[in-house]
Design a protein with these regions (language model features):
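Surface-exposed substrate-engagement region within the catalytic domains
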Residues: 1-94
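A recurrent domain-boundary module in secreted/ectodomain proteins
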Residues: 90-104
Length: 104
């Protein structure tokens, strides 16, 4: 699993995972796209503002090594108390709404 609970772009995650696969024969991977639509927000990892949903879940990734794009992290699940969020793992409606509203 690549990019779980993170905001790295799908392109960046794919490049990293393919590099790892060079050293691990026959390995495949999935990428968490649940909230990477706008990529990371600088070094802010705890409920960063302005993020959006990424690609919807699919097995059509365009790469034989990548089995699927999945929403592993529940959109709206808090990273922790940073930026006004509740404790980690709690659903935060404000963030969930922002992810949806900022999506293409």
């Amino acid at each position: 699993r690549v990019n779980v609970s993170n905001y790295r772009t799908t392109e960046e995650s794919m490049k990293w995972a393919l590099k790892v696969c060079e050293y691990r024969e026959n390995d495949c991977f999935v990428i968490d796209t649940s909230r990477n639509g706008n990529g990371p927000h600088g070094n802010d990892w705890c409920n960063p503002p302005g993020r959006s949903l990424g690609l919807p879940p699919t097995c059509n990734t365009g790469n034989d090594k990548c089995d699927a794009f999945l929403w592993v992290k529940i959109p709206g699940e808090s990273d922790g108390k940073g930026n006004g969020g509740p404790r980690a793992g709690r659903f935060w409606g404000k963030m969930g709404s922002e992810l949806v509203n900022n999506s293409n």
